[in-house]
């Protein structure tokens, strides 16, 4: 049975999309629901999200943000107040038209995002500069009626956090926007072991209604980019539309400066596609629901289960640990926990007990070592950190190996046709060139990185003077 289970995973080299689907199903992260595009987060998948949420929530509270909750319904008239915003989301909006059998006087939108609700609220509670800043965060689900869906990456309903803040000055709102982007980047790198590129979105790719959008981009196993998190500076675009004013220090009315930012369960899709392999899920230790699994060998023999339980009591002081004392074979268990991506497996049987040791196996490298039982409390935390570093370094090496430089149109064509990954190239800043590259090569601008490189004098597309180096790529 174990063999059949492993063989059920399609190899990523053969069909990456099917490989991904196999993993999310076989690792019991999600199940499909009866509503197209909606997923059921199973206990293991939800525990993974909870661990991510816990870290993020603590970091936001440490920086002065407060959690709130807004309604899930938005009146159509409220959504219409910011023109660019509503146009950007209109195709994805789900509408409620009836309450019971009664037709509603006004359609209600099921929130695709909550800017308009926060704006309405802010306009009621802010009068003076003494009321600023307001630093709010919301954990909720949102609905976007997507045409093509895939678990975690693009679903009709998904879980996320969305932050909304208002400030006295443009400088404060810009600082907030970039501070949050840095928080997201450090979370990805320090907890998910995913290396990211920080940068600004082009006008074409920025959030509907924003003055500027900043992003963290990561590279998946198949060479496609994933926008892992975004932070938006709205300037006064929304505050003018919603009349969010305050009396400044000179007694004059001013519009607030506003930000919005968010990350979602899409991050789980990212960590699957960055770290996992043809044997199943590989989880970064810091967010893994279970960090260590103990598999008793010949558990029917006297003393084996007792010793496994004793080890669990010691290890749970330093890691999230479970014992599998079920009557399934050790081979089945090995494959099961390999599939679920548990970072460390410990095997303990009669011979190990005699030698006062355990067999320790790493999920990421399959390396095996013998560890004295009295050293486990020390060895396990150190090894979990080693695994995190190894996963990060491996992902960064992959990204670097699959990042290419193009200095002219023909070079870009050759790379786009033959390779998968990021393409660094210069750009003049014109929308026409951005759209032509998308049309010709299927690549979009991922970001204008903060760390700029001067690769050439001319735009990759039109030959005019270049203004920015841009990361281009095919993306989810």
UniProtKB/Swiss-Prot annotation:
Function: Catalyzes the attachment of proline to tRNA(Pro) in a two-step reaction: proline is first activated by ATP to form Pro-AMP and then transferred to the acceptor end of tRNA(Pro).
Family matches, as Pfam families: HGTP_anticodon, ProRS-C_1, tRNA-synt_2b
PANTHER family with a match to the protein in the record: BIFUNCTIONAL GLUTAMATE_PROLINE--TRNA LIGASE (PTHR43382:SF2), PROLYL-TRNA SYNTHETASE (PTHR43382)
Protein's UniProt keywords contain Aminoacyl-tRNA synthetase: yes
Family label: Belongs to the class-II aminoacyl-tRNA synthetase family. ProS type 3 subfamily.
Protein name in UniProt: Proline--tRNA ligase 2
GO BP, sorted A to Z: prolyl-tRNA aminoacylation
């Amino acid at each position: 049975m174990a063999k059949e289970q492993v063989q059920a995973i399609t190899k990523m080299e053969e069909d990456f999309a099917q490989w991904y689907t196999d993993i999310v199903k076989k690792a019991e992260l999600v199940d499909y629901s009866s509503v197209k595009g909606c997923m059921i987060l199973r206990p293991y998948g939800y525990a993974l999200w909870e661990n991510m949420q816990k870290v993020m929530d603590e970091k936001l509270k440490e920086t002065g943000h407060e959690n709130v909750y807004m309604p899930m319904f938005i009146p159509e008239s409220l959504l219409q107040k910011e023109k660019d915003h509503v146009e950007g989301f209109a195709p994805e909006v789900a509408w409620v038209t009836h309450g019971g059998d009664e037709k509603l006087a006004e359609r209600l939108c099921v929130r695709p995002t909550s800017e308009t609700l926060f704006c309405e609220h802010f306009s009621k509670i802010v009068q003076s500069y003494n009321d600023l800043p307001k630093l709010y965060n919301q954990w909720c689900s949102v609905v976007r009626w997507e045409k093509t869906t895939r678990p975690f990456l693009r679903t009709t309903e998904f879980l996320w956090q969305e932050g909304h803040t208002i400030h006295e000055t443009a400088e404060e709102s810009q600082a907030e926007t970039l501070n949050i982007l840095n928080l997201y980047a450090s979370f990805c790198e320090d907890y998910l072991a995913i290396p990211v590129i920080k940068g600004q979105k082009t006008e074409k790719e920025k959030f509907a209604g924003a003055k500027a959008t900043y992003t963290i981009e990561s590279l998946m196993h198949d060479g496609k980019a994933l926008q892992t998190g975004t932070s938006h500076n709205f300037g006064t675009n929304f505050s003018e539309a919603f009349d969010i004013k305050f009396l400044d220090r000179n007694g004059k009315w001013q519009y607030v400066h506003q930000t919005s930012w968010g990350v979602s369960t899409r991050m789980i899709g990212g960590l699957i596609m960055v770290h996992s392999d043809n044997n199943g899920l590989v989880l970064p230790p810091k967010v893994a629901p279970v960090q260590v699994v103990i598999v008793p060998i010949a558990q029917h023999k006297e003393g084996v289960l007792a010793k496994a339980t004793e080890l669990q009591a010691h290890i749970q002081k330093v890691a999230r640990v479970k014992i599998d004392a079920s009557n399934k074979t050790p081979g089945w268990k090995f494959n099961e926990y390999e599939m679920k991506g548990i970072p460390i497996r410990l095997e303990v049987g009669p011979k190990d007990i005699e030698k006062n040791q355990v067999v320790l196996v790493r999920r990421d490298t399959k390396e095996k070592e013998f560890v004295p039982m009295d050293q486990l409390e020390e060895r396990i935390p150190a090894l979990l950190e080693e695994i995190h570093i190894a996963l990060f370094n491996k992902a960064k090496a992959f990204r670097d190996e699959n990042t290419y430089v193009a200095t002219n149109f023909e070079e870009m064509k050759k790379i786009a046709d033959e390779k998968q990954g990021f393409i660094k190239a210069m750009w003049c800043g014109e929308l026409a060139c951005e759209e032509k590259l998308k049309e010709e090569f299927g690549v979009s601008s991922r970001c204008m990185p903060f760390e700029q490189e001067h690769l050439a004098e001319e735009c990759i597309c039109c030959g005019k003077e270049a203004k920015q180096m841009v990361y281009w790529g095919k993306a989810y």
